[in-house]
């Protein structure tokens, strides 16, 4: 009679833990997460500073934002090659006594309509240098393309979609020097298809760019938006005294 040798379950568990601890990185580009937070009674400003510094030491770009309005008191935006470092940042934020009341997960990407764009422009989208100097007015919102029967973006021919997006991009380029925009992809990762992060010199620039681009057909007919969050980019050492 033959006998099968079966490893004890603990060895399988050990192997799975080892594999799970490996970096979780996109094949191209970077992972991006936006955390929107409110302080709990256990809030510890020094612990928040330590969490941010630890993440930065691990190679994460961290942008801290003093938020306006009731939705959140602080936003922490993390950009990293390894999602596990973003998870460590999330844990540090929570251990500092901040309750995460909303969040958004996405990846840097280049548009399917960007064929022929210079390599340096493509790299700027995949590996952005953030935050931009002098642009401390900050806004984030998620969006998707409409899928209604009459206005279904995904049933349009590629050339038509490209034409509409080129028109949309032309409107955005009129704000060069005033706005830095980061569009990140989130299909299959979060509730919408893209996340849009805007940096501006003045808050009215944020309002004007969104208003202007709403008139483009790609937005007016085919776009759906989630909640908007607005705040001011603020160093974490200052931010902890504003929470």
Model-assigned labels for residue ranges:
Residues 3-54, 81-85, 103-170, 187, ...:
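Short S/T/G/P-rich N-terminal loop/turn motif that feeds into the first structured element of a domain
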Residues 53-75, 100-110, 168-192, 209, ...:
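Short, glycine- and small/hydrophobic-rich beta-strand elements in well-ordered beta-sheets
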């Amino acid at each position: 009679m033959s006998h099968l040798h079966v490893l004890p379950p603990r060895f399988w568990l050990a192997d799975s833990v080892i594999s799970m601890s490996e970096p979780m990185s996109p094949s191209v580009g970077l992972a991006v997460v936006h955390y929107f937070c409110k302080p709990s009674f256990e809030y510890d400003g020094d612990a928040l500073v330590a969490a941010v510094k630890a993440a930065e030491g691990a190679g994460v770009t961290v942008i801290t934002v003093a938020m306006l309005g009731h939705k959140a008191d602080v936003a922490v935006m993390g950009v990293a090659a390894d999602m596990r470092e973003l998870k460590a940042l999330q844990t540090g934020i929570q251990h500092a006594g901040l309750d995460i009341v909303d969040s958004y997960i996405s990846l840097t990407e280049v548009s399917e309509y960007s064929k022929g764009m210079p390599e340096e422009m493509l790299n700027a989208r995949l590996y952005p240098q953030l935050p931009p100097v002098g642009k401390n007015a900050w806004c984030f919102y998620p969006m998707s393309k409409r899928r209604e029967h009459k206005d279904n973006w995904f049933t349009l021919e590629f050339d038509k979609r490209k034409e509409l997006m080129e028109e949309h991009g032309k409107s955005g380029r009129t704000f060069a020097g005033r706005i830095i925009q980061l569009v990140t992809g989130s299909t299959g990762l979060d509730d919408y298809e893209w996340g849009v992060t805007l940096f501006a010199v003045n808050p009215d620039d944020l309002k004007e760019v969104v208003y202007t681009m709403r008139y483009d057909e790609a937005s007016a007919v085919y776009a759906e938006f989630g909640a908007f969050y607005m705040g001011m980019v603020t160093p974490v050492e200052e931010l902890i005294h504003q929470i």
